[in-house]
């Protein structure tokens, strides 16, 4: 197993375990409580991650089967490393807010109370999909963002973006949990 693969899968697994241990005991009311009209609930944070990550599945499946070729843009974009690093660094800054780029990944207001279990299953699934791309060259395989069609980044950066995005929303959910008016039961 290459070191990138083991690092990414370990970090992804760690996020899933932390989410299960921190939020797995919460009630439906707690999962769906919002800190304000514009704020997301804990459940919405994790529903959003599932929806977002699933947008990469078709690409990952094609990469793992060896059926995917870089597009012309992906082959010749001089900015792939720049965009990858930009996204990674932006996701690390919690103060910077992003608006979801497409309604497809905006979670509904009411989230199923078993979202933590669903997220745990999702983490297992995405880790398996990442492992299946082990034989691809993560530095030479360039993918296009499912949200901004002119933004490309290396597969290695794509995986780092997934991890940073998950960690960002984990921190957001922790802030909701620590909010002054968060329901105790």
Kindly give the residue locations of the regions a language model identified.
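Extreme N-terminal tail/first-helix region
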Residues: 1-17
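Residues that form generic nucleotide/phosphate-binding pockets
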Residues: 11, 22, 59, 63, ...
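Short, Lys/Arg-rich amphipathic segments at extreme N-termini
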Residues: 12-31
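Hydrophobic alpha-helical core bundles mediating ligand binding, dimerization, or RNAP-core interactions
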Residues: 16-19, 53, 119, 123-126
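A short small-residue
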Residues: 30, 99-107, 146-152
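Short, contiguous alpha-helical
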Residues: 33-90, 124, 131-132, 136-185
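Acidic/histidine-rich alpha-helical segments that form the ligand environment
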Residues: 82-137
């Amino acid at each position: 197993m290459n070191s990138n693969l083991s690092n990414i899968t370990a970090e992804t697994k760690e996020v899933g375990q932390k989410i299960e241990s921190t939020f797995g005991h919460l009630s439906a009311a707690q999962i769906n409580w919002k800190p304000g009209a514009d704020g997301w609930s804990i459940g919405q944070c994790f529903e959003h991650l599932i929806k977002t990550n699933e947008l990469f599945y078709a690409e990952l499946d094609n990469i793992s089967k060896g059926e995917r070729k870089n597009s012309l843009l992906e082959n010749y974009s001089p900015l792939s490393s720049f965009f990858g690093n930009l996204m990674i660094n932006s996701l690390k800054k919690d103060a910077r807010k992003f608006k979801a780029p497409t309604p497809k990944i905006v979670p509904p207001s009411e989230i199923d109370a078993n979202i933590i279990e669903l997220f745990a299953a999702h983490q297992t699934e995405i880790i398996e999909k990442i492992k299946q791309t082990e034989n691809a060259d993560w530095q030479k395989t360039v993918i296009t963002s499912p949200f901004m069609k002119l933004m490309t980044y290396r597969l290695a950066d794509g995986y780092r973006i997934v991890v940073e995005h998950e960690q960002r929303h984990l921190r957001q959910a922790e802030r909701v949990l620590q909010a002054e008016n968060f329901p105790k039961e």
